[in-house]
Amino acid sequence: MEVKVSMENSEAGYKSVSIYSNSGIILEEVTDRTNLREACKTVQKNRGAPGIDGVTVLEYACMRETKGYKELSQIIDAGKYRPKPVKRVYIPKANGDKRPLGIPTVEDRVVQQAIANVLSDFYDEKFSDNSFGYRPNRGCRDAIRRAIKYANEGREWIIDLDLSKFFDTVNHSKLLQVLSKDIKDGRVISLIHRFLRAPVSENGKVSEKTKLGTPQGGPMSPILANIILNECDEMMDKAGIKFVRYADDMMIFCTSKKAAERTLNRVTKFLEDKLFLKVNKEKTKILNYSKGTQFLGFSLTKRVPKHIKETCPRCTIYVTVH
């Protein structure tokens, strides 16, 4: 099936091309009214505060029940949808710092969720088996089980890798380049780009269009994070590097300290040179399980009873929840 993209869309900033159903995601999948309706249900379920327009989730859902989704679908299809500025708030962190959180309007959240639904369906089978964050039927406990498995196989030297302000520093051009490898419909890429560049509203002042990052708080951010970090996952899988990743939290498992040092250099070079991300060298650590470590809110501890230390060089890795 061929889908024609009109010159009107081209004038709105989209490429005038012919899109085929075998070319990956097409815009009509995003704007399908059933998908938009399901996206609205997800936003309702997640609740959340109003964006800069003050419209609540309940108010928006009631309005859509009355008006339906035809008009919204047509606006997006015509290339005329424009995201509103994202409302910025700050959430306290355990260490006393504050984490910036972006609150899009409810309608923008619905459209983002519609995009995320389609991206997730398309990309999930492409993701590494060692990736656990924001994926169907996977969670923290699955990530911990995989970490325990790798450690019990003798890979007890661990790289606890920290990406510096990951969500705020994702390079838009690189992300769009990665997306374009699989998505040939320029209309989809342009719509995602508009959301990435949406201005930020803070204390009543609206900034210029955003140049970096996928603000935490938008439904698209988790899947976009997985898509760009899957580039590094693929490199590690091909190299036989054992790792566990949950969104931007990553642990890499090695058999010796020297191997861990070499692997850290290789992974850091890829993340910084290929994906234009920044590894936080102060927080990134190489450690041994014998001293215990934290991952995703769990304590991973190697317990060796004194009377078997000499006869049992390996032991079970235990996990306790905090």
Q: How should each PLM-predicted stretch be described?
A:
Residues A39-V43, A114, L191-L196:
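Short alpha-helical scaffolding segments that buttress acidic/His motifs in well-ordered protein cores
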Residues R197, K274-H322:
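A conserved non-catalytic segment of reverse transcriptases
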Residues Q113, N117-N130:
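Electropositive, glycine- and tryptophan-enriched low-complexity nucleic-acid-binding patches
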Residues E107, V111, A116, L176:
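Duplex nucleic acid-engaging cores and interfaces of nucleic-acid transaction enzymes
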Residues G68-E71, I75-Y90, A94, K126-G292:
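Conserved polymerase palm-domain catalytic core
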Residues P100-L101, T105, K309-C312:
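Conserved phosphate-binding loops in nucleotide/dinucleotide-binding enzymes
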Residues M1-M63, Y69:
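Non-catalytic, polymerase-adjacent accessory regions of viral genome-replication enzymes
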Residues V86, T105-R109, D121:
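Acidic, glycine-rich two-metal-ion catalytic cores of nucleic acid-processing enzymes
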